[in-house]
C-alpha cells in the first residue's frame, strides 16, 4: 500500500512554482496536562500570557503617574522585558517538535517578570478634613493660567459638582477608579491627573468662580443657576486636553452661565422715563404702551414701510401703483369716468341692464331657444322645458309629506305646502285673509272680497305656480 510520502515522491514538481508545491509536515501528538480529559485540544500557536489575578488589589502603571509628578522612572527594566519577550516568541517553522507545555512555561515567566516591575503607588494629594472641603482642588499653575488677561475660563462643571456615586457623598478621599490593564504601556493614553478629585454632595453650594465679580450686581450667593451635569472625567484626562476642549467650544457656551450685562439698557430706560411725561411713565411701568403714549412709534413705522399710493379723489391709499389705477378706473365713485355708469339696453324692449350677462339672459325671453318636441311650446330656460315634458309623461317626482299629493315641479310643491301652514305668503289688504297662491288671492279680490277691488290687492311674494313667460 502506498503512503502519502510515496505518492509525493513519485510525482515530479520541478516545473511547479514553489508556492503551489505541496509541503510535507510531520506533527507529534501533544501531551495533555489538563485535569479534565474531555476538553478540546488547544491549537493556538501564539504567545499566551497568564496573569495572576489579585481581587484585593489593582495594578496601576507607575510610569503613568510618576511622569506626571516629575519623578524620574528607570525604563531599563522595560527594555530587558522586551528582550525577554522577543526571546520567548515561539517559532513553529524552525522547531516543530516544541510542545505546548514549553510555550506555557515561557508565558508564565514573562508574566512573573511583568508583575515584579509594577508597584502600586500611594496617593500624592493631601487629605482634606471635613471643614476644608470648600477649598478648590486646583493647583497654583491652573489659577495663574486662568487669571491671565483675556483668558477668563470657567472650570468644568464636572469638577465642582458632586458625583452621583454614594461613596463620594460620604466624604471619601479615594481617587477615582482606574481601569488600567496589567502591564499597560504609558504611550497608550495620556497620564492621569492626580489633582482631579470629586467633591461630595454636601458641598454643592460652594463653587469657585475664576472670573471677577462685576460691579453693580448683587452678590452671587443668591444667584441660582441650573448646572448641566457632564459625563464623569475619564482617567486619561490631562491639563492639555482640558484647554484643547475649552478652545474647541464656542464662546457663547462659556458666557451662557454669566448674566447679561443690562446696565446700559437700564440707564437708557431710566433716562427715557425721566424725560417723558408722567402718563408715559405709568404706562411703561405697567407694560401697556399704547400708540397715544408713544409719539415716535408712528414715525418709526412709516420709515420701515414702503411708500403708498394715495387716490386724490377719495383719499384711499394702495401699496402698488396698479392697485391705485384699477381703483380709479372701476371703483372710485368720485372719478370723472365713473360718474356716468355703463348701461346695456334691449333692442326688442326698453329694459336696460348694468351688465352684459344680464342682458343676454333677458334676450332669451324673446328668442325662446328651448322648444318641446311634442307640442311645440318654447321656453327660455332648460329647466322650464324639463318641467313641461313631465306634464306629457305624467311623472310627478315631488310629493307632499302631509297629504301625499305629488307634483311635476318643485315650485308647485312649495306653493302647496303653504296650504298646510297657518301663515300664508299672500294676504289681502282689505280683509287680512291669507292665501297660499297668488291666483287665489286675485280671485278673492275680484269677486269675493266685500270692500276690495282689483287694484287694491297687493302681494309680498312672486308667483311660483305658472310656466308661461311674461
From Swiss-Prot:
Disulfide bond residue pairs: none
GO biological process, one term: branch fusion, open tracheal system
Positions of the UniProt region annotated as Disordered: 271-309, 448-470
Entry GO terms, CC: nucleus
UniProt subcellular location: Nucleus
UniProt keyword list: Activator, Developmental protein, Differentiation, DNA-binding, Metal-binding, Neurogenesis, Nucleus, Repeat, Repressor, Transcription, Transcription regulation, Zinc, Zinc-finger
Main localization, broad class: nucleus
Entry comment describing in which tissues the protein is expressed: Expression is complex and dynamic. In early embryogenesis, expression begins on the dorsal side of the embryo. Expressed in a pattern of longitudinal stripes early in germband elongation. Later in embryogenesis, expression is in cells that correspond to the wing, haltere, leg and genital imaginal disks and the abdominal histoblasts. In the embryonic leg disk, expression is restricted to imaginal cells. Also expressed in the central nervous system (CNS), tracheae and head of stage 14 embryos.
Any one GO molecular-function label of the UniProt entry: RNA polymerase II cis-regulatory region sequence-specific DNA binding
Recorded superkingdom: Eukaryota
Keyword Metal-binding on entry: yes
C2H2-type Zn finger ranges: 309-331, 344-366, 370-392, 398-420, 426-449
Tagged with keyword Zinc-finger: yes
PROSITE patterns, A to Z: ZINC_FINGER_C2H2_1 (PS00028), ZINC_FINGER_C2H2_2 (PS50157)
Primary role: Transcription factor that can both stimulate and repress transcription. Binds to the consensus DNA sequence 5'-A/GCAGGTG-3'. Regulates cell motility and adhesion during tracheal morphogenesis by stimulating transcription of the DE-cadherin gene shg at branch tips, thereby promoting tracheal tube fusion. Maintains diploidy in imaginal cells by inhibiting the transcription of genes required for endoreplication. Required for development of the genital disk and acts as an intrinsic determinant of wing cell fate. The somatic protein is required for maintenance of male germ cells.
Family: Belongs to the snail C2H2-type zinc-finger protein family.
Protein name: Protein escargot
Organism name: Drosophila melanogaster
Amino acid at each position: 500500500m502506498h503512503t502519502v510520502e510515496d505518492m509525493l515522491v513519485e510525482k515530479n514538481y520541478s516545473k511547479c512554482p514553489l508556492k503551489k508545491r505541496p509541503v510535507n509536515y510531520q506533527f507529534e501528538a501533544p501531551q495533555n496536562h489538563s485535569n479534565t480529559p474531555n476538553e478540546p485540544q488547544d491549537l493556538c500557536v501564539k504567545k499566551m500570557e497568564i496573569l495572576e489575578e489579585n481581587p484585593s488589589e489593582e495594578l496601576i502603571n507607575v510610569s503613568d503617574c510618576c511622569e506626571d509628578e516629575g519623578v524620574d522612572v528607570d525604563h531599563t527594566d522595560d527594555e530587558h522585558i522586551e528582550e525577554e519577550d522577543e526571546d520567548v516568541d515561539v517559532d513553529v517553522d524552525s522547531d516543530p517538535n516544541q510542545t505546548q507545555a514549553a510555550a506555557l512555561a515561557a508565558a508564565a515567566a514573562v508574566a512573573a517578570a511583568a508583575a515584579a516591575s509594577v508597584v502600586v503607588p500611594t496617593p500624592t494629594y493631601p487629605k482634606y478634613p471635613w471643614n476644608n472641603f470648600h477649598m478648590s482642588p486646583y493647583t497654583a499653575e491652573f489659577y495663574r493660567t486662568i487669571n491671565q488677561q483675556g483668558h477668563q475660563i470657567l472650570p468644568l462643571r464636572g469638577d465642582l459638582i458632586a458625583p452621583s456615586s454614594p461613596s463620594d457623598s460620604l466624604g471619601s478621599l479615594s481617587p477615582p477608579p482606574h481601569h488600567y490593564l496589567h502591564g499597560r504601556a504609558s504611550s497608550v493614553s495620556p497620564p492621569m491627573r492626580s489633582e482631579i478629585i470629586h467633591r461630595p454632595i454636601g458641598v454643592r453650594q460652594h463653587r469657585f468662580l475664576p472670573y471677577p465679580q462685576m460691579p453693580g450686581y448683587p452678590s452671587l450667593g443668591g444667584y441660582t443657576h441650573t448646572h448641566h451635569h457632564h459625563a464623569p472625567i475619564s482617567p486619561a484626562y490631562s491639563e492639555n486636553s482640558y484647554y484643547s476642549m475649552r478652545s474647541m467650544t464656542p464662546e457663547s457656551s462659556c458666557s451662557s452661565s454669566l448674566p447679561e450685562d443690562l446696565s446700559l439698557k437700564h440707564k437708557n430706560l431710566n433716562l427715557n422715563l425721566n424725560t417723558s411725561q408722567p402718563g408715559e411713565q405709568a404706562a411703561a411701568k405697567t407694560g401697556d404702551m399704547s400708540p397715544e403714549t408713544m409719539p415716535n412709534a408712528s414715525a418709526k413705522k412709516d420709515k420701515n414701510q414702503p411708500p403708498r399710493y394715495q387716490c386724490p379723489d377719495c383719499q384711499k391709499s394702495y401699496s402698488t401703483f396698479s392697485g391705485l389705477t384699477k381703483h380709479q378706473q372701476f371703483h372710485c365713485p368720485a372719478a370723472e369716468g365713473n360718474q356716468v355708469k355703463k348701461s346695456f339696453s334691449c333692442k326688442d324692449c326698453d329694459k336696460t341692464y348694468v351688465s352684459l350677462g344680464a342682458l343676454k339672459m333677458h334676450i332669451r325671453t324673446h328668442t325662446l331657444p328651448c322648444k318641446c318636441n311634442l307640442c311645440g311650446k318654447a321656453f327660455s330656460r332648460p329647466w322650464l322645458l324639463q318641467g313641461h315634458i313631465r306634464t306629457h309623461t305624467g311623472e310627478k317626482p315631488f310629493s307632499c309629506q302631509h297629504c301625499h299629493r305629488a307634483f311635476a315641479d318643485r315650485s308647485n310643491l312649495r306653493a302647496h305646502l303653504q296650504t298646510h301652514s297657518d301663515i300664508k305668503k299672500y294676504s289681502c289688504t282689505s280683509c287680512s285673509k291669507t292665501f297660499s297662491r297668488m291666483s287665489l288671492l286675485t280671485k278673492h279680490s275680484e269677486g269675493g272680497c266685500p270692500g276690495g277691488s282689483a287694484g287694491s290687492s297687493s302681494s309680498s311674494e312672486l308667483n311660483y305656480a305658472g310656466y308661461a313667460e311674461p
